Amino acid sequence: MEVVKHEEGFEKLETNPNINRKVIHLKDLMFTVIEFSNGPMEMPDPPHNHPHEQISYVAAGKLKLFVEDREYLLNEGDVFKVESNLNHSIQTLTEFVKLIDGFSPIREDFLKRSH
């Protein structure tokens, strides 16, 4: 067991100046904190998919979630689930959005971007 206080054990990922992503993981479970400070977005991010299951908690802000051909309006405190291989994307609707994401299995592609 390990206790992480104030995100000291998180790895920071290189993204861009307007997106801050931190990650911590076990063998089969990954937890990320992602902060968008470039909103509101004019257009949604390009759709993407991955073999990982994802559950995300909207910790701050407001966004639109697009999953396949469906659109959802999400506010602080809402949660969304994305099954494996479904096309999905988001569009931030406020200046700042913070998401807490869980992935299983872990996103090896994220670890390759950490420093």
Each language-model region and where it sits:
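Catalytic-core "active-site belt" of small-molecule-metabolizing enzymes
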Residues: 2-8, 15
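A short glycine-rich, His/Asp/Glu-containing loop-to-beta-strand
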Residues: 11-45
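Double-stranded beta-helix
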Residues: 30, 95-115
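Short, conserved beta-strand element in jelly-roll/cupin
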Residues: 36-37, 49-65
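A generic "binding-loop/recognition-motif" signal
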Residues: 51, 70, 86-87, 95-96, ...
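Short beta-strand His + acidic residue motifs that chelate non-heme Fe in jelly-roll/DSBH
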Residues: 65-66, 82, 88-93
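Short acidic-glycine-tyrosine-enriched beta hairpin
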Residues: 69-84
